[in-house]
A protein has these predicted regions:
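Generic structural signal for secondary-structure transition and capping sites
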Residues: 102, 184-188, 238
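GST-like domain detector, emphasizing the conserved glutathione-binding G-site
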Residues: 18-148, 272, 279-282, 291, ...
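GST-like fold's C-terminal all-alpha helical module
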Residues: 122-231
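Contiguous C-terminal substrate-recognition/catalytic subdomains in enzyme active sites
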Residues: 222, 240-242
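N-terminal amphipathic/basic-hydrophobic helices that include classical n-h-c signal peptides
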Residues: 1-22
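Mixed-charge, Lys/Arg-rich low-complexity intrinsically disordered regions
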Residues: 242-272
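Short, structured interface segments
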Residues: 229-240
């Protein structure tokens, strides 16, 4: 999506499940591409927890046949696979990693409401950064890449984007100013002495500026605490990474376990849909619509059953908020 290569990107780079997921035998497979700030968030989660993981590189633009098969049609980045379980969006990825590594530093350490608010805050900051990136690089992109980005972000008027838009720069400065103020409370990280989801969500956006938006770096450089924090986040690393091919993921799907499904409460408005064919899609961008059988739904998550390989079912976990369901006709 951005104007940097994968090598540069890589360099810069609620309950415990007992007896269900064995870290020694069930690999963490991240389907992603390095130049996405959302992939960088997931990679930093691995570094925060000191985890070993495998990377399957997905294409930057559609079609993405392997990940679309795995998810039932969703093609956003990143996607975390653990055996037969497939986790969509960094919100679900963070929860999954906290569950399988309960002894390590917690990502969602301060409660669901705060973590959800921080997730939404990061999404809001992404908008002016996205517009800055589109304005800076669209003239350099090949026609198929530009067409894909116009499809993914249909609400953006690509023809009116201004590289030096002062209002956009002011918005970025406002967001980063709140980070600087929080760091002024005297802790190494935004929530205290230990990095958590707050830092992860800010990291992806500040990484994007450092890596691909040099025109915005003068704004970052006016905030000294933010600069020091960025170095501390860099030092966390990205865990122990191994690059693998898609065949490894298919074998993990065949051999791996599936975690227990959550109960669907009787009070859940979508409870009558359980067992039916549904579609689910993100509301903020066109990342593809996933189709499958609704297995469970509650206030935190939606689980679909899909069949990436004939006779092999995957359980695909989506966040409940930010994604919209409809019954298939």
């Amino acid at each position: 999506m951005l104007g940097l290569d994968a090598t540069t990107a890589r360099r810069q780079g609620l309950q415990v499940l007992t007896g269900i997921i064995n870290m020694a035998s069930t690999a963490l497979i991240l389907h992603q591409y390095d130049v996405s700030p959302f992939s960088q968030k997931a990679q930093k989660m691995m570094g925060l927890k000191g985890l070993s993981w495998q990377s399957v590189e997905m294409p930057m633009i559609a079609p993405k046949p392997h990940v679309e098969a795995l998810t039932g049609g969703y093609r956003g980045t990143p996607v975390l696979q653990i055996g037969r379980d497939v986790f969509i969006d960094n919100w679900m990825i963070a929860r999954a990693l906290d569950e399988i590594d309960a002894a390590g530093p917690a990502i969602n350490a301060q409660g669901g409401l705060r973590d959800a608010a921080l997730y939404a805050w990061g999404e809001r900051l992404f908008t002016p950064l996205l517009h800055a990136a589109l304005a800076a690089y669209q003239s350099e992109w090949e026609a198929d890449f530009l067409a894909d980005r116009k499809r993914v972000f249909p609400d953006v008027d690509f023809d009116t984007l201004d590289v030096s838009d002062p209002d956009r720069r002011s918005q970025v400065r406002a967001y980063l100013g709140t980070v600087e103020a929080q760091l002024g409370l005297g802790q190494d990280f935004l929530g205290g002495a230990q990095a958590d989801s707050w830092d992860i969500h800010v990291w992806g956006m500040v990484w994007m500026i450092h890596s691909a938006l040099p025109a915005l770096m003068p704004i970052v450089e006016t905030f000294p605490r933010l600069a020091d924090w960025y170095e501390r986040m860099l030092a966390l690393g990205t865990g122990d990474r191994e690059d693998v091919e898609i065949d490894v993921a298919w074998q993990a799907l065949k051999d791996g376990p599936a975690r227990p499904l959550p109960d669907t409460p009787d009070q859940e408005p979508l409870a009558p849909w359980v067992g039916e064919a549904v579609d689910i899609a993100a509301g903020s961008a066109d990342r593809g619509s996933a189709s499958g059988r609704l297995l469970a739904v509650d206030h935190e998550q939606v689980v679909l059953g899909v069949e990436p390989i004939i006779g092999e079912e995957a359980h695909v976990w989506f966040p409940r908020f930010g994604y919209h369901l409809k019954q298939r006709a």
